[in-house]
Amino acid sequence: MSDELTTTVYYDEDADVSTINDETVAVLGYGSQGHAHALNLHESGVDVIVGLRQDSSSWADAEDAGLRVETPDVAAGEADRVVMLVPDTIQPAVYEAIEDELDAGDTLQFAHGFNIHYGQIEPPEDVDVTMVAPKSPGHLVRRTYERGEGTPGLIAVYQDATGNAKQESLAYAKGIGCTRAGVIETSFQEEVETDLFGEQAVLCGGVTEMVKAGFETLVDAGYAPEMAYFECLNELKLIVDLMYEGGHMGMWNSVSDTAEYGGLTRGEEVIDREGMEKILEEVQNGEFAREWINENQANRPAYKQYRDAEQNHQIEAVGENLRELFAWGEDADAETTEAPADD
């Protein structure tokens, strides 16, 4: 099996922040990603305006951090590069408010390609449309930058009206610290489809359902809920950390032979590959996107029901009680509050 990379990775030496030093960058949103992008760019010598609603609770925070703040339309009107860092669901409305401020040669930039790929935003042909996407929560983008490090990221060019879209995207990625760790070149389609599939089938959907099913199996069989929680949820972090640091083999080499043999011989029994293929197909053909767009237009009735069911699951109460009893719970709960939604 070849170990050669199939994608291009760029680092600091491949990018020059001065490429965008003569630009004004409007960062729309000041939540998890927005605050990190704005502050990191500002400290990299880039002229930044933060675009927020006048009643935004983040307005004062951004000003206190030394940033200039304007409404989105004003920020976009003064900017050469408009960076959409508000949630996907409100981006079309924000774009409608700022689209007349885009001039030929400007750049419309995203951190996720959902609205471009699925046609919710259709930019004019005379602007660059790009993506710079850190593969990390915003608070880590900021924290690692302050330490002189960075988080990996992606760049993509959807529309290159100026001929400079790629180099300027790399410059932006360097400005927020991503080229310190490495930036992969991809496409809007690939980023969106792999991201949605990963979230649904593995990272957010698959893992949580597997944890709940394991917890329920043990509790239904008469085992203590606290033991079920430790075995199926708490220890998951330990295993994922090993995989993150050393891949699957790094994990297998760190667990007992009994755990390794049991995992290798039984793990496949809990995986539904046909279900995974169906999830991917619904991402690729736009079925999931249409469902999610319609759900938002209907004020999220199903979404709210699913969230209520999660909140009321026994594993939540058991976990809350255990986290109050053990020191690691304080760190875990604090970590979940560090990344507010973009405003």
From Swiss-Prot:
Involved in the biosynthesis of branched-chain amino acids (BCAA). Catalyzes an alkyl-migration followed by a ketol-acid reduction of (S)-2-acetolactate (S2AL) to yield (R)-2,3-dihydroxy-isovalerate. In the isomerase reaction, S2AL is rearranged via a Mg-dependent methyl migration to produce 3-hydroxy-3-methyl-2-ketobutyrate (HMKB). In the reductase reaction, this 2-ketoacid undergoes a metal-dependent reduction by NADPH to yield (R)-2,3-dihydroxy-isovalerate. It comes from the Archaea. InterPro entries: 6-PGluconate_DH-like_C_sf, KARI, KARI_C, KARI_N, KARI_prok, NAD(P)-bd_dom_sf. GO terms for molecular function: ketol-acid reductoisomerase activity; magnesium ion binding; NADP binding. Belongs to the ketol-acid reductoisomerase family. The active site is at 112. GO terms for biological process: isoleucine biosynthetic process; L-valine biosynthetic process. This is Ketol-acid reductoisomerase (NADP(+)). It catalyses: (2R)-2,3-dihydroxy-3-methylbutanoate + NADP(+) = (2S)-2-acetolactate + NADPH + H(+); (2R,3R)-2,3-dihydroxy-3-methylpentanoate + NADP(+) = (S)-2-ethyl-2-hydroxy-3-oxobutanoate + NADPH + H(+). Mg(2+) 1 binds at residues 195, 199. Its cofactor is Mg(2+). Mg(2+) 2 binds at residues 195, 231, 235. It is an enzyme of class 1 (oxidoreductase). It comes from Haloarcula marismortui (strain ATCC 43049 / DSM 3752 / JCM 8966 / VKM B-1809) (Halobacterium marismortui). Its EC number is 1.1.1.86. Residues 7-186 form the KARI N-terminal Rossmann domain.
